[in-house]
């Protein structure tokens, strides 16, 4: 609903700049406005927000593992059945039981990162009701302290504390990067429509010129100043431009539909893009760009995370292959009684210790093989990440160098466009005066059209490189500030 209101507001503001006869359902968008809409309403932007929220709550879950947790449990049960009961003399006898067991337990637990174990504190009460004779009794655990620990095992808490902060930092950087890529994609859609509309304008202009020249040539042919072949060539030019105009209209419709879909515009609104001729004139310090990319890019954080994950896998494989030992110990105070008060009087000591050991004697090299596989995977990851880092560095350098050249290319393309238009006008006048051939005229038309298209492409290349460089470095070189987002607003 908000996206529709925003688009209709833009539509209202844009349409007020046109006469009523020409403004029906026409939305004029600049590149800046296009990017603003795309960052709010495009499918890529919405997916990025949901992805970040998922990573955020995953990080919250990770942090909660290192905080105390308080849990209440109760498992009341009713039993009316015949069960074997051991008598004082050691014999067993089937006895009908009709009883109700109710309990309540409160447990406070805390994971210990350094050891990977867990410390817990419990307090609970049980009540047993014998329904046949209407008697009851209580059992209490006033306080119970316990600890469980896997000795020589894999410490997942320690490795998670190394990996998860890096993963969340990567998620934050990835969101900023994705929004810059959304800007780059919006720029692509914008200039695709700009190119299509430029081609349509070219086709309309060329058709009008071809129609005028063909009409003029008919008169010259009637008085014998041009050959039939030349007049037929002009007729072919006219028909070709008419066909080009129809094809260009189809391209405009297709690009406009794609453009609307990406911006989240569901209404059948005609859009006209307003391409600004000027581009910001500034150069990027290549060394600074490379340094910022290594600090800010999520690619670098991802490399670090994957290395840590591979080392964690090796540690887990080693722990699984060797000696395993688990210890469980609890100490507390307990008592029973026929009344609740008596169940808390003179509590008795309660101790319980359990140690479990597992050592593989014969596994046919399975444990060793798991370790070797994990080590090979780790070495492969380290090799791949070293290559990825080198490729990333080369990509940053290439994009920065290309961007620094692009403002000059835009100026050259603009000058070429103006010169080609002037040359076409001169060639047309010379042809009308009979001082030029149809071949020269056609060549000037082709050069004019190519120059206009090259100019639009040069503008697109500038902005594509601009947003690509921002996505690689997460830095705005125009304003000299780091790119960031209001992450708190994303999780609301």
Label for each model-derived stretch:
Residues 72-78, 121-127, 327-333:
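Transmembrane beta-barrel strands of outer-membrane/channel proteins
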Residues 36-46, 53-69, 105-137, 145-162, ...:
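A glycine-/polar-enriched beta->alpha junction
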Residues 162-166, 172-292, 402, 447-448, ...:
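Periplasmic alpha-helical coiled-coil/stalk elements that build and connect Gram-negative outer-membrane
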Residues 35-39, 91-93, 226, 230-231, ...:
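Amphipathic alpha-helical coiled-coil scaffold segments and their short linker/junction regions
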Residues 47-62, 178, 182-204, 214, ...:
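Amphipathic alpha-helical coiled-coil segments
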Residues 1-27:
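Bacterial Sec-dependent N-terminal signal peptides
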Residues 96-100, 137-139, 347-349, 450:
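Short sequence motifs at beta-strands and strand-loop junctions characteristic
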Residues 18-24, 71, 80, 279, ...:
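Acidic, low-complexity, intrinsically disordered peripheral segments
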């Amino acid at each position: 609903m908000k996206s529709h209101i925003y688009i209709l507001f833009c539509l209202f503001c844009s349409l007020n700049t046109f006469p009523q006869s020409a403004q029906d359902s026409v939305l004029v968008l600049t590149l800046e406005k296009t990017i603003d809409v795309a960052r709010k309403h495009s499918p890529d932007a919405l997916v990025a927000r949901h992805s970040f929220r998922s990573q955020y709550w995953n990080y919250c879950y990770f942090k909660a593992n290192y905080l105390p947790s308080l849990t209440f449990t109760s498992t009341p049960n009713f039993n009316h059945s015949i069960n074997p009961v051991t008598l004082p003399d050691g014999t067993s006898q089937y006895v009908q039981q009709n009883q109700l067991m109710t309990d309540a337990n409160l447990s406070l637990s805390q994971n210990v990162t350094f050891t990977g174990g867990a410390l817990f504190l419990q307090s609970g009460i049980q009540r047993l009701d014998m329904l046949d004779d209407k008697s009851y009794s209580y059992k209490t655990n006033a306080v119970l302290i316990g600890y469980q620990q896997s000795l020589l095992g894999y410490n997942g808490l320690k490795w998670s504390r190394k990996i998860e902060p890096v993963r969340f930092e990567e998620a934050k950087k990835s969101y900023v990067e994705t929004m810059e890529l959304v800007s780059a994609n919006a720029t692509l859609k914008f200039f695709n429509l700009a190119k299509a509309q430029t081609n349509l304008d070219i086709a309309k202009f060329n058709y009008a010129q071809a129609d005028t020249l063909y009409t003029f040539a008919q008169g010259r042919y009637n008085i014998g100043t041009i050959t039939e072949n030349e007049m037929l060539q002009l007729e072919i030019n006219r028909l070709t431009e008419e066909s080009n105009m129809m094809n260009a209209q189809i391209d405009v419709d297709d690009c406009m539909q794609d453009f609307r879909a990406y911006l989240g515009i569901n209404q059948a609104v005609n859009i006209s893009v307003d391409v600004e001729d000027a581009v910001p004139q500034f150069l990027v310090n290549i060394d600074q760009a490379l340094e910022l990319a290594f600090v800010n890019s999520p690619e670098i954080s991802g490399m670090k995370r994957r290395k840590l994950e591979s080392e964690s896998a090796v540690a887990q494989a080693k722990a699984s292959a060797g000696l395993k030992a688990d210890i469980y110990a609890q100490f507390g105070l307990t008592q029973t009684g026929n009344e609740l008060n008596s169940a808390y009087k003179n509590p008795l000591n309660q101790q319980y210790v359990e140690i479990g050991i597992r050592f593989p004697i014969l596994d046919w090299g399975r444990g060793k093989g798991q370790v070797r596989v994990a080590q090979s995977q780790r070495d492969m990851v380290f090799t791949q990440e070293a290559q990825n880092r080198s490729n990333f560095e080369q990509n940053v350098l290439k994009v920065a160098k290309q961007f620094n050249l692009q403002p000059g290319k835009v100026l050259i393309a603009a000058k070429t466009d103006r010169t080609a238009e002037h040359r076409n006008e001169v060639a047309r006048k010379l042809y009308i005066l009979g001082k030029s051939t149809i071949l020269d005229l056609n060549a000037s038309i082709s050069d004019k059209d190519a120059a206009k298209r090259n100019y639009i492409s040069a503008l697109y290349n500038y902005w594509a490189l601009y947003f690509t460089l921002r996505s690689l470095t997460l830095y705005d070189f125009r304003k000299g500030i780091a790119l960031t987002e209001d992450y708190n607003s994303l999780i609301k």
